[in-house]
C-alpha cells in the first residue's frame, strides 16, 4: 500500500487542549513539537501520510512554517481532507472579508488565486494534493443549482485545480499524486456523470459508521490512479456522533477494508 495514514479531525476536545496546556503551552496550540510526535507515531505504525488538524480551534498546519519542515524531516507525505482543495484549510484560512465569498460561481478567480499561492508555497515538499470543491468546513457548497449544473461546476473546479498543479509543479501533472474523495453530497455528484482524469486516486468513503458506501466497479478498477479509503473510527456529526468509545469492531474494519483492498484500494 503506497500511502497509509490518518486525518486529525475533531481535535477540539483532545489534541488541542493537551498540546496547548501540557506540551506546547508557550504556543497555546498544536504546533511543530506536537506534529513531531504525531509523525513519529506514524512511522512506528508503518504509516507515511498525514492530513493535519483543520478545525478553527487549532492553528492551521500551513500557517506555521516549521511544521512543513517537521513532516519533511520524518519523510511524512502531507495531504488534506476531502473538503480542503490543494492543501488549503478552508475552515480557518479562508477570510471572506479579504478573499471574497467561498463560492465558485461568484468568486472563481479569487479562489484559484489563493489555491495557486498554496501550491507554490508547498511544492518543494512531498504532498498528495486533494482535488475538491465543497462548502467551508465540511459542508455542501451553498447553491440552488440543479444536479447537472453542480456536475458542471465541480468538473470545472477540478480542471482548474489540475491546471494550477501543472503550471506550478515542474513535472507532468499526471505524475503528481492527486486524490478525490466523493464524500457526502459529492458522491451523488460523482454518480451523476462527473469525469475524472485516469491518474487521480478515488478515495471511497464509508458511511461514517464503518460501512463502505461504494467500491470501485469494473471500469474504475482499470484506472491507473487506483483507489483508496476514507474510513472513520470516530465521528462528529449528524445523525449521531461517537468520539470517546471504540465502537467499530476490528472484525468489521477488516471485512470492509478487505473488500476495498480487493477492488484496487491499494
Indicate where each model-derived feature is located.
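Glycine-rich, aromatic-flanked loop segments that form ligand/cofactor-binding clefts
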Residues: 1-15, 72-90, 201-205, 209-210, ...
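An acidic-aromatic substrate-binding cleft motif
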Residues: 1-27, 33-53, 225-228
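Glycine- and acidic
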Residues: 15-25, 47-53, 97-101, 136-148, ...
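Short helix/loop capping segments that flank catalytic or ligand/cofactor-binding pockets
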Residues: 15-18, 61, 88-89, 140-141, ...
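Catalytic domains of carbohydrate-active enzymes, especially glycoside hydrolases
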Residues: 27-56, 63-66, 70-81, 124, ...
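Short, glycine/acidic-rich beta->alpha junctions
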Residues: 30-34, 58-63, 182-186, 247-253
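Structured mid-domain segments that build the active-site/substrate or prosthetic-cofactor binding neighborhood
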Residues: 43, 48-52, 58, 66, ...
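Gly/Pro-rich turn-and-neighbor structural signature
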Residues: 55, 62, 70-73, 97-224, ...
Amino acid at each position: 500500500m503506497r500511502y497509509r495514514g490518518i486525518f486529525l479531525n475533531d481535535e477540539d476536545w483532545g489534541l488541542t487542549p493537551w498540546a496547548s496546556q501540557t506540551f506546547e503551552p508557550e504556543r497555546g496550540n498544536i504546533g511543530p513539537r506536537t506534529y513531531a510526535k504525531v509523525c513519529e507515531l506514524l512511522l512506528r505504525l508503518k504509516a507515511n501520510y498525514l492530513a493535519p488538524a483543520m478545525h478553527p480551534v487549532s492553528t492551521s498546519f500551513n500557517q506555521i512554517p516549521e511544521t512543513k519542515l517537521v513532516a519533511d524531516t520524518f519523510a511524512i507525505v502531507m495531504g488534506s481532507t476531502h473538503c480542503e482543495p490543494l492543501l488549503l484549510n478552508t475552515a480557518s484560512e479562508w477570510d471572506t472579508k479579504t478573499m471574497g465569498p467561498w463560492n465558485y460561481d461568484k468568486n472563481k478567480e479569487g479562489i484559484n488565486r489563493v489555491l495557486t499561492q498554496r501550491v507554490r508555497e508547498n511544492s518543494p515538499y512531498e504532498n498528495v494534493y486533494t482535488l475538491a470543491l465543497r462548502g467551508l468546513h465540511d459542508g455542501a457548497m451553498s447553491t440552488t443549482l440543479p444536479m447537472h449544473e453542480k456536475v458542471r461546476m465541480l468538473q470545472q473546479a477540478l480542471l482548474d485545480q489540475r491546471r494550477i498543479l501543472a503550471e506550478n509543479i515542474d513535472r507532468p501533472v499526471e505524475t503528481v499524486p492527486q486524490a478525490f474523495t466523493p464524500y457526502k453530497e459529492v458522491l451523488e455528484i460523482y454518480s451523476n456523470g462527473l469525469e475524472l482524469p485516469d491518474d487521480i486516486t478515488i478515495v471511497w468513503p464509508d458511511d461514517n459508521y464503518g460501512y463502505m458506501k461504494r467500491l470501485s466497479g469494473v471500469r474504475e478498477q482499470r484506472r491507473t490512479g487506483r483507489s483508496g479509503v476514507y474510513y472513520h473510527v470516530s465521528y462528529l456529526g449528524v445523525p449521531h456522533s461517537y468520539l470517546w468509545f471504540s465502537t467499530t469492531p476490528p472484525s468489521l474494519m477488516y471485512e470492509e477494508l478487505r473488500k476495498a483492498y480487493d477492488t484496487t484500494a491499494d
